[in-house]
Structures are given as C-alpha cells and as structure tokens.
Amino acid sequence: MALKIIKGNIFTSQCQTLVNTINCVGVMGAGIALECRLRYPAMYSRYLTLCKEQKIDIGLLWLFKGPDKWVLNFPTKRHWKGSSEESFFHAGLHKFAQTYRERGVTSIAFPLLGADRGGIAPSRSLEIMTEYLSTLDIDVEIYEYDPLAKDDIYASTKSWLLSQDAADIAQKTSIRIDYVYKLIEAMQHSDIHQLNQLARVEGVGIKTLEKIFVQARNQSFSEQETQQKRLF
C-alpha cells in the first residue's frame, strides 16, 4: 500500500486512525496533543487516569476509538519538559508494526515523530519512520506540520466567537470578559490559523480554549438538531 509524505494539517486526513504524540505524565498542552485534548475530551480524561495509574509508557500504544476517528496515542517523551529519543520511536513503531492488524487499523496518519518539540531532526525522524512503515499493507500518511494549514475546528470556533456578543460569551462560559476580548482580537490576527496556536497568546490559557471550544461545539450541535427537526 501507499506511504505518502504530506505537508499540512493531520486533522484533515481521511485516514481511519490519527497518531497523537504524548508524554507519560498526563500533559497535553501544545501542538497536536492540545488539538486532541480539545477534540476528544473523553480521551483526554482517560489519558489522565492512565498516567496516574502509570499505564502510559514508552513502547506502549493506546488506541482510542472516537466518534469520527480513531486516535493512536504514541509516547515520544517520558516527561513533557524532556526531549524525545530515537529509541522511543523504535519501540513504538516496532509495537505498531506487530499489532496494527489485530487492532483493526486500516489506514493511519502520523505526524513526524519528535520533530516539533522533541528535538529530533525531521530528516532523521522520517528515516526511522520509513524503516518501519514503508512495508505495511495499509495506507500510511506522514505529516510534516504546516503552521499555515487550515484547521476545521478553528474556522468553526472563530465563526461562532465573532458572531456573538462578548458579554454573552463571558456569561455562558464563565470566562472573564477581558479574556474574551483577547480571544476575539487574537482570532483576527493573520498569523493564527489553528486552535492550538491561540495557546501562545498572552492571557489565553488552555482552560479558556476548552470553554470556548465546548460552547462553540454545543451551539453547532444545537443548530444542527434544530435544522434536522425542520426537515420532518
């Protein structure tokens, strides 16, 4: 089957399974992990529990089956402050190559392991990954992160936020109104294209992002239900 190298946003992949790179101490605070935390809150909650029980470790892969995608959680660090090591990639990739069939994985999209915040050169990461993934009998995509790539949930969240009154948002989400204004201002910056990038804005914390995303998602679901009722 095909192995494709793509520069873009992994969340636009049509693959059945996406790979989320994680540490072993219960922190999903940046990059793809933060996106997964926002998109799959039940997975994040379970991840915290597994870390407390010390069941997340290098070489152990945890498959979460979400409503739209499966997510393969792949430890690339022991601690979020630490660096990735090539041996961590070998351990996880070997495990994946040995178990993907029995786990029911039919296609999968990986990020370049450790190439963003892990300290591993992208070329070296790709070399190691290709060694294990190029001979598999499923479609595999390897994504080189593109900070300019479009993000579907950012677009929908931005559309909702900019269509609302700031005071109403503050009341519905229990976010201080000055933080709401910071978010509104940040979402109009030309250099922000993805939800995880908002975390770098001063005064915008992860909890704030979670509250905004949940409110936007719930509003979207409510509108969809209303529209469906009108069809009958």
Feature-to-residue mapping (PLM):
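Macrodomain-like recognition of ADP-ribose-binding/processing modules
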Residues: 1-232
